[in-house]
Swiss-Prot record:
Binding site for ATP: T55, A56, G57, G58, N59, G60, K61, T62
UniProt keyword annotation of ATP-binding present: yes
Gene it is expressed from: lpxK
Pathway: Glycolipid biosynthesis; lipid IV(A) biosynthesis; lipid IV(A) from (3R)-3-hydroxytetradecanoyl-[acyl-carrier-protein] and UDP-N-acetyl-alpha-D-glucosamine: step 6/6
Reactions the enzyme catalyzes: a lipid A disaccharide + ATP = a lipid IVA + ADP + H(+)
Entry-linked InterPro entries: LpxK, P-loop_NTPase
Pfam families: LpxK
Family, similarity comment: Belongs to the LpxK family.
Protein's name according to its UniProt entry: Tetraacyldisaccharide 4'-kinase
Record keywords: ATP-binding, Kinase, Lipid A biosynthesis, Lipid biosynthesis, Lipid metabolism, Nucleotide-binding, Transferase
Length: 325
């Protein structure tokens, strides 16, 4: 229903317009307060790069963050990552992730980034505090924030926006009548726009999410998705249909598609009934970090990696490296 409203296919968005006007007014006043100095942003002693979006829902920010961390590491630059930690409920914040940190504490995306990259990661609703605890423990060269474009309390040196190239901005309205956190005109003030799938416009950086082999949660075995019989797919991400479409493009024959809420907490009680012993369950890597502790032998996940082409990604990396020098 939300997808239909935000795409403009349902007239119900008209009923939500008063709330959207209020959202736009409040968010605009907040930005104005920072712009004219009524509110002040905290500036970290190292460069800060924000990877965010203008819309609610999954656009592919986390794969971009992972790509940036890995690419900078290959060039000798140590990046740390901060996040709000959506879906996590730690006893106290800020929280510096360790190998024992759970998704219940830190949220799924920070744990995924930590496990994939090995980079220092800290979470807190106050991202400035997350940066401070991160820097106190790790002498990183640069900080990347996973989301936080609208968190103006943290000063930033570069802003990168990730857009879903298929959905773009939906009906173009602010939340809740539409998907927008800020208006599309905000793109004129950011440093780079990365478009995930679809068609990139002039000046934008095209990106694709490339899947690899499916990985068994229990054993680590790898198989081609097309070789997994009796397959049931589940996805607790911002836009589950994208994951299901990716599986089908890999040759999967899905017996069922189960969309879940983004950042939804998962337990054995939630997941185990989704498949029989004769079926295989496949999920996103973001869901896998929540399920690994109670995984079954017929549960798999599909890793994806951001892939770029052309010279623009390298130019972006050069810009980030110049901040450190």
């Amino acid at each position: 229903m939300i997808a239909r409203i935000w795409s403009g296919k349902s007239p119900l968005w008209l009923l939500l317009l008063p709330l959207s006007w209020l959202y736009g007014l409040v968010s605009g006043l907040i930005r104005l307060c920072y712009r004219i100095g009524i509110k002040r942003s905290w500036r970290a002693p190292v460069p800060v790069v924000v990877v965010g979006n203008l819309t609610a829902g999954g656009n592919g920010k986390t794969p971009v963050v992972i790509w940036l961390v890995e690419q900078l590491a290959h060039r000798g630059i140590q990046a740390g990552v901060v996040s709000r930690g959506y879906g996590g409920k730690a006893e106290s914040y800020p929280l510096l992730l360790t190998s024992q940190t759970t998704t219940e504490q830190a949220g799924d995306e920070p744990v995924l980034i930590f496990q994939r990259t090995g980079a220092p990661v800290a979470v807190s609703p106050n991202r400035s505090e997350a940066v401070q605890v991160l820097l106190a423990a790790h002498p990183v060269d640069i900080v990347i924030t996973d989301d936080g474009l609208q968190h103006y309390a943290l000063a930033r040196d570069k802003e990168i926006v990730v857009i879903d190239g298929v959905r773009r901005f939906g009906n173009g309205w602010w939340l809740p009548a539409g998907p927008m956190r800020e208006r599309a005109s905000r793109l004129r003030t950011v440093d780079a726009v990365i478009v995930n799938g679809g068609e990139a416009l002039p000046g934008e950086i095209p990106m694709r999410l490339i899947p690899s082999q499916a990985v068994n949660l229990l054993t680590g075995e790898r198989r081609e998705v097309s070789q997994l019989p009796a397959l049931v797919a589940m996805a607790g991400i911002g836009h589950p249909p994208r994951f299901f479409a990716t599986l089908e493009q890999c040759g999967a024959h899905l017996e069922a598609r189960i969309p879940l809420a983004d950042h939804q907490a998962l337990s054995i009680v939630d997941v185990d009934p989704l498949v029989t012993v004769n079926q295989n369950l496949i999920m996103t890597e973001k869901d896998a970090v929540k399920c690994r502790a109670f995984a079954k032998s017929n549960w798999w996940y599909l890793p994806v990696d951001a892939e770029f082409s052309g010279e623009k990604p390298e130019l972006l990396l050069q810009e980030l490296m110049s901040l450190v020098r």
